[in-house]
């Protein structure tokens, strides 16, 4: 048995945005592969998507911009990072449009309130049918199709920004990187 004492020192850089992207992707895959709980998996995917873009622009801003304001709104941060490298922000067109929608979705849930929605309609037929329940805007947004589109657009936006800033590592596929030194103590 080796009783030597070893000291390990170094630095680990954890790419939070990469974890959030993986979480959004995993939740979407779960929604696609199983009807059971798919609404909740879509919800998680879209929320993680919104968290991811904010984490990514924080990553870029803190690394590349000297006067970064981490307390600005996520969309203001996105605009600032994009402007620095000549990327046009058009919230009326994909893929940027999806960043706005996902952020609005996230805000609806993060600052959620109990909603009261009016119900009034007439229908012919059997009275045993289920009542058509009205849905909030965030509930209407929470679909597999939307979650998939937002994730595709998120990836496109991040890759575009990443390429323009010429980072040394890929935007995706790496969750963390670092270096370590192991020293055997005598």
PLM features: residue spans?
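Acidic/His metal-coordination segments adjacent to aromatic residues that form catalytic metal sites
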Residues: 83-92
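Charge-enriched, short contiguous segments at helix-coil
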Residues: 93-101, 105-174, 183-186
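Exposed alpha-helical structural elements
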Residues: 15-23, 76-80, 98, 153, ...
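Charged alpha-helical initiation segments
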Residues: 1-42, 178-186
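Short, solvent-exposed segments of well-ordered alpha helices
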Residues: 7-15, 32-47, 93-96, 100, ...
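Short, flexible helix-adjacent loops and helix caps
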Residues: 29-36, 61, 65, 114
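Short, contiguous, well-structured surface segments enriched in hydrophobic/aromatic residues
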Residues: 22, 43-80
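Amphipathic alpha-helices that form helix-helix packing interfaces
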Residues: 24, 45, 49-56, 102, ...
């Amino acid at each position: 048995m080796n009783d030597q004492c070893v000291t390990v020192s170094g630095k680990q850089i954890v790419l939070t945005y990469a974890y959030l992207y993986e979480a959004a992707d995993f939740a979407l895959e779960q929604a696609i592969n199983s009807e059971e709980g798919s609404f909740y998996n879509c919800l998680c995917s879209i929320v993680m998507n919104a968290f991811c873009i904010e984490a990514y622009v924080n990553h870029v801003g803190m690394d590349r911009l000297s006067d970064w304001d981490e307390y600005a709104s996520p969309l203001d941060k996105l605009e600032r990072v994009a402007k620095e490298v000549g990327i046009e922000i058009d919230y009326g067109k994909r893929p940027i449009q999806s960043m706005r929608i996902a952020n609005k979705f996230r805000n609806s849930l993060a600052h959620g309130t109990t909603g009261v929605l009016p119900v009034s309609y007439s229908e012919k037929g059997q009275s045993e049918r289920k009542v058509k329940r009205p849905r909030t805007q965030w509930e209407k947004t929470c679909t597999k199709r939307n979650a998939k589109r937002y994730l595709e657009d998120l990836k496109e936006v991040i890759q575009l920004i990443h390429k323009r800033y010429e980072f040394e590592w890929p935007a995706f596929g790496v969750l963390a990187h670092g270096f370590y030194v192991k020293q055997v103590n005598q």
